Amino acid sequence: MAATAQYLPRNNSLPSNPLMHPDSDRMHQGTTYREVQKMMHQEYLQGLATNAGHPMSLTHHQWLPNPASDWGSGSHLGAQAEHGKSGVQSSREDLSSSFHHHRSHLVHQQTPSSHAWAQSGGHHLPPMSPGSNSHQPLIYSQSSYTNLNGMLGPQASSLHHSMRDPLHDDPGVLDTHVESPPQHLSHHQDHSDEDAPSSDDLEQFAKQFKQRRIKLGFTQADVGLALGTLYGNVFSQTTICRFEALQLSFKNMCKLKPLLNKWLEETDSTTGSPTNLDKIAAQGRKRKKRTSIEVGVKGALENHFLKCPKPSAHEITSLADSLQLEKEVVRVWFCNRRQKEKRMTPAGVPHPPMEDVYSQAETPPLHHTLQTSVQ
């Protein structure tokens, strides 16, 4: 009875229950074990005060007893208590030497003993706050911190990286796939953009083309015929007119623009030499200016027509020189005047000489009267 008295609680308020719990996994130790735990708690608080670190920075004490060991047996309890007291002194040196070594590995390092403490029944009890000064009579253990170390071990860290990597890496990969189009599509789009002119370019070219065409003296029909001579495809005057007025479709405007541009270049390069001028004239009809004859010049031509309605080439040349007209203008005027006189004379009636008609008439002809009134 005296041998077992040292293992009994000091207060008599505890019920007379056996030290061993019916559950073989959980055991409640005596007062001596609680004194050892209080000493360990004080050492833990001193370690926090000196090192100013987080509770997770302290490594697991290898000298902490395992509840699954022979602590429950009364024959070994005293020896284990004495061994625990001596272990307190040795643990101070172990903590100071191993603190800096395990500081960088506090998350990824895990010892087998921490698993044993994680499986023990001590972590079911509420842990004591490191900052509190009150000493609770409950058993204190570091199982809560070792459980955190176990949770933040290599498996948990790899899980943490696997959860974090899709959030940081995959969006970049997805962005590159979404933002960068396929290469063949981008090349095709660049090629089409370079070939097709814009609407502003077409409008500017149509305006410049019309101005240069008029300056060179070509009609729209002349340009259409010239394109047929150069490229084998004759365009109508309506097509050239609609191009200048921007009334063609965008596709047809783009097709016709290079042809007209090349025609302008050919025309500019061939302007000046007589042989090339003949070549340009063969490509299309050149615009002819309408000749306006003055009233005095027209009266002189009428007098010469009354004398000789069909003059010779020599007479036409001398008359053109005297009136300062072109030979072709004088010739065309006499042709038109004869056609007019033929329309005025009825068919089947013999045509008297023009001089006899004008001399026998009491009044001058009608065209003479009109010409005199105008003068």
From Swiss-Prot:
Subcellular location: Nucleus
Keyword DNA-binding: yes
Biased composition (Polar residues): 107-117, 130-139, 151-160
GO MF annotation terms: DNA binding; DNA-binding transcription factor activity, RNA polymerase II-specific
Source domain of life: Eukaryota
Residue ranges occupied by any POU-specific domain in the UniProt entry: 194-268
Gene Ontology cellular component list: nucleus
Start and end residues of each stretch annotated as Disordered: 1-29, 56-139, 151-200
Regions recorded as binding DNA: 286-345
Keyword Amino-acid biosynthesis: no
InterPro entries assigned to the protein according to its UniProt record, in alphabetical order: HD (IPR001356), Homeobox_CS (IPR017970), Homeodomain-like_sf (IPR009057), Lambda_DNA-bd_dom_sf (IPR010982), POU (IPR013847), POU_dom (IPR000327), POU_domain_TF (IPR050255), TF_POU_3 (IPR016362)
Signal sequence segment: none
Gene3D superfamilies given in the database record: Homeodomain-like, lambda repressor-like DNA-binding domains
Alphabetized UniProt keyword annotations: Developmental protein, DNA-binding, Homeobox, Neurogenesis, Nucleus, Transcription, Transcription regulation
Composition bias type Basic and acidic residues, residue spans: 162-171
Major localization listed first in the record, in broad terms: nucleus
A Gene Ontology BP annotation from the UniProt entry: brain development
Pfam families: Homeodomain (PF00046), Pou (PF00157)
Function, as annotated: Acts as a transcription factor. May play a role in neuronal differentiation.
Protein family per UniProt: Belongs to the POU transcription factor family. Class-3 subfamily.
Name assigned to this protein: POU domain, class 3, transcription factor 1
